[in-house]
Each structure stands twice: as structure tokens, then as C-alpha cells.
């Protein structure tokens, strides 16, 4: 619950509520709508009829639990059963059976779906709303050309445009346009009806000549003319039913189906009263649109802003799942139709069970969740990431935009985003502005609009009412901005307040206000709402902070922030990582595995806890019990904290003592200097779990097998395997050790043996193994402890069932040089040096500083909020207080943030008897000492407690070295990237740098032996072993030879010539 400055109480909606409401709408309405569209299917002789009785369909409770679905790599889904009937018209008999249609993946309590053991989430898509939109563009002569775009429910466009002679054209393609009278006549209107239904009949009569009047004389002629122009067909086509069907399929179905949203928008924009159930474009719509276009030409009416949210709609999870369900039913219809015809042809008696298969529905949803761009793997780096992912909104995807074609105006912030889409939280890079995040109070309306709540101000009654407004409604209201919340009712009537009206920001009297914001967080997303003092930060830095909080790694010992915003508890609660008591009761047993709670009766409920579970970002998800045995609980209390939560609050980082000062250049360019206390005290230690898997296959020589008897391998590498050939739980694994022993059979032909094998067989008669080892080995950087092994046997119809073995290894990672850390204000940096604590700068009470940041990173980046947080955090640490501060506290008075921080520092200095905490000469700063010499620094320095996060970008995942590896086939140069064991490339600029220092031999090595000279790099190994001199290469490297070949493909021969020193005679020598 949040209370604003004056009165009224408002509950923050659940952060996953949008996902829940969308899925519930699909189950409650979408399934029924699509099932009612399923037609009655008859055979060719119309003797048998198949139909579904959709009013009594049922979904069965899943047979497995969520945890089991994840563990066994299954889909958490429900079976759909629908009654079906098969009617014989000749005998009037009917056979009714309840048939299994397929599996529908369900949504769990996190708002996600589990498909093949993987958490997946469907994000919301923003599309152009169907309807008509008017805009004006300048042609090459600088004259305004007015156009009206009719957008269908499927995204198809039809353009109407009016030229300088006031002639109206319908554009059927980029190059073809025809008179507006032709499509109107093709849709069934004659010329008299057209003239009777328009406001400007004289304009419609002005431009058709006798030839054009003949084209629209009848509907058939109009359809032929329309088809000829649309399909670019020459000659004289003949009117036929097939031609009409083709035109219907290619044009009218794609460009003229408006849908419910399009019909509502069309009626509202053109002031029509066509019934809402009429979902297709009518001649009356086209004529009204042309009338409106003529009015635009003569200065009447307003143009449309295509980027306004009232002209956008949201495709939520309900719409996407319903579309896929409809697609699956169409496929099922084709299957049933083909099966009926086949049964009649072979004189078989069909039954509903035989006609229907579950394959279309199951495969459609598996394909959707696995391949659709809007179905993404849930990012589970930390609890915040999980809930933010489900609230994303994207302009990308099918029917949407692409990152390369989207204009700057689409990406930019729009006034209609206020309270609906966060103006800060978006992705960086090519998709900036195209992937946003919904504001925390926003909700999705029934017809796909984003609604935001406001308090309605009534002059008659003093009661406060909450109303949700869609983007097309709040333009008619004067909405007071958030800084008017703290005014008293008596003073408000005399105040002049800033307000928003028709996308403009005004300053008006309070009595003219209709609505006001409910809370300052209203227009921010969850990530931006967790930044304290966000009003003091530049928006670009706040954007970085919103993104970097989602990259924070859960630490082994979490700690909640001293300075927060108050939303930490709600974020942790809605993320689902904490265990919550679902009823009143008493704790009767607790351990690391489960908590047993006794309810009101004698029943005991066992609540399993998550123990060292791997997320898809390799972070560790773990729950720790927080309740002792014998404690009585109320419903909703915390039973166990999850990863990155403490006491039910979000805890992504640590409160550490920081100072802003240069230190020997080690914090140059955002580098960070840290104390060794952060390493040895396990302050920033985190656990990471990696998954390694191997699968057995059936080869042409026989099946592969798992065993611990691997020939030709050292016993040291096999020391951790059990009798089955699988690594034992609890083993400590080093790089190169065998995790799973596997042998693959190979051919026993004599020619396939190596020479030494043939020699052994000939001399000693030893039988050489006919299997090669294809074991699962631990790669570089994977050392750790085995915490879980899963042996999954996949069932199948064959005698051999493939097996999959997964090994989970836990790593303990301390913070080290190269790791990335960041604050909550966009202040990020890389660890450059770890100093002994005695060498770190220390305070006047002897406390060494934990981190040293560069002070130059503050003024130019304008993220001053970190200074307020730093100073207030120091006061909170000394006073043992936690602060929760809403943004924009300047709405109370000027310099409110400074007036909050300084009194707290003053009180801390008094209570702790440390006058250096608050010195009036330089408040917020203190004189500190150099740990190496003990001398004070020349200038006072800002010191304090900041909340610093350790990010997922860690040096252990990025550092890479190569001694030998693969080469590219064409250029024969080392591959690129850590994943391919690639090498460094000495490019053009690197060669310039080497040439600048005159290092000729190093340049030659880099360009020949260590790169793409095939013969030379083979000779290097032998000469190195015997200690000889590496010979100079005699021919050109492979990249030069490639250049020569490419020139030859262009018919250019490249030769080189030698000029003798004596007589300068030219001797030709072939290259």
C-alpha cells in the first residue's frame, strides 16, 4: 500500500499481474472463441458430418509438478478434452465421444511457462492499431500531399491520396494507383449510391471521363479493372469466380479485415455508426474516408500522430496464444477432412477418436514457444530480472518493426507514454527505444490499450476516486503533475500548478484540474523505481542503472540497502524467489530441504525449498529458512529468503565504504580500486553453477555406451568416475578431468588402423580396441565441485533408448581484477587493483576504505544522486537506520534532498562523537589519510556508504588464451572468439604500431608463423623441439595467395619483378 502526500490509499498492482490477466483471458475467452470458429466438416458425398461441442470442453490438471517438469525436461501443460460428434445423415445416427485435442502449456505462479524444462516468457508487442490514419507529406515540388492509410487487423495497408486537382486515388501497390470509384464499385456500390453517400459529390463527378465511367458501370467491370491494376495483368481478362476468389484471398482478406479494434477506431475517427460485429471494410467506410480526406485538403480536421499510444495496441500473451490456437485448429481441420475422405475411400467406419490427433495443437505450441521472437527464455540472473522481463514491451517481432528500419521518431519519448511506458528503461544499442518497459501502475485494457490510474478531483465531494484512463481519453482532461501531491487542501485552491493537457505542459490554477497523479513512481518502470535520488541523475545514466541492476549477481551473503526507495519488498515478493506462508500455522520442523507447517487442523504441509538450483545465466538460486521451529505465522509471512533477498526485501549488492579520489592512476577511466577485505571477507563472493551434458547416439557401427573402462587414458583423469562411468557427487573436478566416460564404436577395417596399431597386431597379436573414446571432459575454466548428476533415459518405441547425462558443477568466485562492479546511478567500472587493507586510504577513526572511485566520473555524467546516497548511507550506517525515499522530494521544498542528508550526517556526528562525519566547512566531505605513508591527503574527500553491485560480466567468463587451435578454411588464419578457441588477429592498425617501433622480426612472426603461413608454422614445432633456428619462409603466406586468386577471378594477373643492382635490367620471375 502506498499513501500519497495528502490522502487516499492505493495498492501497487502485482508486477506479474499483466501476464496472469492475459493468460486468464486466453483460457476464459480465447479458447471458447476459437473453438466456436471450428466448422462442421463433411465428406465429399455429404453423408458424414463431424463437429465439436465446444460448450463443455475441459482442461485437466497437470499430471506432473513444476519442479518435476524442470528436472525431467518436460513441458508443464494441461490436456484439453472436447466432446465431438460424428453424424451419419443417411441413418440420422450420431456417435459422440470426448476426444483429446492436445496439450496447452500452462502459466506458473511466476507468470512464465515451462517448455521442455526451460522457463519461457511471452513479452508484449506494440503494433499500429487497425483503423485509418491521415498524414501530410511534401512531394518533390514542395506541395503537401494528403494521404489516408487504412490498416487492417493483419497489418496490411491500403492508401487513399488526393492530388492537387482534388482527385482521389486508391493506391493498390507502390507503383499502381486507381480511381477511388473502382474499389467502391468492386465492393458492390454503383455510381448513384456512391454519390448519395458522400458529402462532396461534385468532386467525385469531376474527374471520371467516359472511359472510366464505363469501367465502373457494373460490378464485374470494376472487379476486372481492379484485378488488372492490382495483379499488373495485361490483355483482357475474363470475369470468373476463380478471379474473384483470388482477389478476395490476396487483397480483401489481408487488407480489409478490421477486427474489433479496427471497427471501433474506424467508427470513432469517421463518426460512423456501423455495428461493432461488422469486422470488414465496407463501401461506406471507404467513402467516408474519402470525404474526410477531402476535408483535410481544404483545412478541416486534424492529422494523426502515428506515434501516439492511442494509435497503438498491445498484443499480449492472450492474443498471441489465441492466434496460435486458431492456427492449430485450422491444421486440425485439414487433418480431419483428409482422414474422413481416406476412411470413406477405403470403406472404413470412422469414429471421433480416429479422426482427431493431438499432433497439430502440441507441435504448434512447441514451435511457438521455441521459435517465436516474442517467446523468450526467461532471464533469471536475479529476482529483479525475472519480473522485469515479463513487463517488457517490444515494437519488434512479426508484423512490427526492425531495428534497422525504425526511425528516430518512433524510438523517441512521447507525451502519451506518461504513466504507461517508462521514459527511462529501454535497451541500449540498435534496439534503443524499441524495447521498453511498462510503468509500475500501468495495465492493459480489454482492447489492447495501455491504461494508467489517476485520482479524480471532485469539487463537490471531498472523496478521492481512482480512474484508469486509456491514451485517447486523458487528452480531454487537465492532469496535475506529481509535484502537486504535497499541497494541503486549503492552500491548493490558491496555488498555480503544472499540468498536462493535450500533450502540452501548462501552468494553471488548481480549480481547473480534473485529475492528478497518484504517486511519483507512476511513470517509472520497476528498475528505474529502485534508484534512490533518481531526480538528480541524467536520464542516460538512469537508463544504464536500470539495465545493470538486472545484471547483478546474487551474492553468497546478501545485504539489503541502507538507502532505498521502498519498492524493494514488493519486487522481492512478486519475483517468487522467497517462500511465503500460504496459510496461518505453526512451524513444526525446518531444515535446509523443507519447512513443515501445521495448519489449523491436524494436517501438516511440507514446503520444499530450492537448494542450489542453476539459473539459465549460471547463477545460483538458493533458499535459506528464516523461521525457527515452534514459531506461529500468519498467512503471507516470509518462510525462507531466496537468492538476493534479505528479510523479504531485494538485496542485489553490498553497502561498502567508498571514497571519491584519484589514487595513483588506478581509477583512471572508470577503473575501481578495491581493498583485499572484499576478497578475504567473502563480501562479493558468489556461487555459479555450470551445466555440462552428453548424449548417447546410435551409430552405423552400433550404439554408444557409458562406461568407466576407457583405454589409452591415464587413471588420474578417471579417478572421479563411479562403476557406471559417471562422475561421483561431491567430487572436486579440475580442467581436463573426465565427467562421463563414453565409447563410440568404430569400423574394424585394417586400413583404418593407425600404423602403430597394425604393428602391434602383426608382432604381438594384440587386439586393438574397436571403439574410440568420446568422453565428456571438463573444459578450461570449469573447475569446481559436482553438486548434481542427472541421468535421463528417453522413452521410445525402439529397443535402444537414448540417454542424456547432465552434470552440474558449482564454482565459488571471489571478486578479482577484471570483474565489473556498478552502483545504482550508472557509475560502473572494472576492478583494476586489489590493495592490502593497510595500504588503502583510511578515515580519521582508522577505518580503511573499501573502494576508491574516480571523482571525474560524477560531474560530466551528471549522476549526482550517488553523492546523496553515499552521504546518507554513511549516516544510516553510523545511526543503524535504513531510509526509504520516494523520488522528486523537491516537490516539498527546494533543496529537499540536501536538507535531508545534512541533518542526518550532523546527528550521526553527534551520536558517535565523531566530528569529522559532518564538518561545516566542507559538509559531506572529510579529511582522510594515505595508508602507505600515514599523511593526510591535500583536499577533503567525499566518503560514505554506497550500495555497489557485482555484475554478471566477470573476468573468468571472458579471459581466454590460445596455444593452438582451429584455422579458417579460406584464409588459414586463426578463428575468432573464445567459444571457437580463436586467436588474436594482428590487423592493419596493429601492424602500423609494430612498424612504428621498428620491430621487423616480431612483425614477420605475427604475419607468417603465428598466422597463415602453413608450411612455416609446421616447421616451427620441430625446430623449437630440437633447439634449432626457425628458417625464413620462402613463399608467400596464405592470405597473400588468396588475394592473388581473387584478382585472377577478376581477370587480373599479378606478377612481381626483380631489378638487378648492376645494370637495372628487368628479369621477369613468375609469382
Swiss-Prot record:
Where does the record say this protein resides?
Answer: Plastid, Chloroplast
Q: What general EC class does the enzyme of this chain belong to?
A: transferase
Biological process annotations from GO = DNA-templated transcription
Q: Does Chloroplast count among this protein's keywords? A: yes
Q: What is its EC number?
A: 2.7.7.6
Q: GO cellular-component terms in the record?
A: chloroplast; DNA-directed RNA polymerase complex; mitochondrion
Which reactions fall under this protein's catalytic activity? Answer: RNA(n) + a ribonucleoside 5'-triphosphate = RNA(n+1) + diphosphate
The main place the protein resides is plastid
- Gene Ontology MF term list: DNA binding; DNA-directed RNA polymerase activity; ribonucleoside binding
Q: What are the UniProt keywords, alphabetically?
A: Chloroplast, DNA-directed RNA polymerase, Nucleotidyltransferase, Plastid, Transcription, Transferase
**Superkingdom of source:** Eukaryota
Q: Which Pfam families match?
A: RNA_pol_Rpb2_2, RNA_pol_Rpb2_3, RNA_pol_Rpb2_6, RNA_pol_Rpb2_7
What binding partners and quaternary form does the record give?
Answer: In plastids the minimal PEP RNA polymerase catalytic core is composed of four subunits: alpha, beta, beta', and beta''. When a (nuclear-encoded) sigma factor is associated with the core the holoenzyme is formed, which can initiate transcription.
HAMAP family of this UniProt entry?
RNApol_bact_RpoB
State the function annotated in the UniProt record.
DNA-dependent RNA polymerase catalyzes the transcription of DNA into RNA using the four ribonucleoside triphosphates as substrates.
Name of this chain's protein: DNA-directed RNA polymerase subunit beta
Instruction: Write the gene name.
Output: rpoB
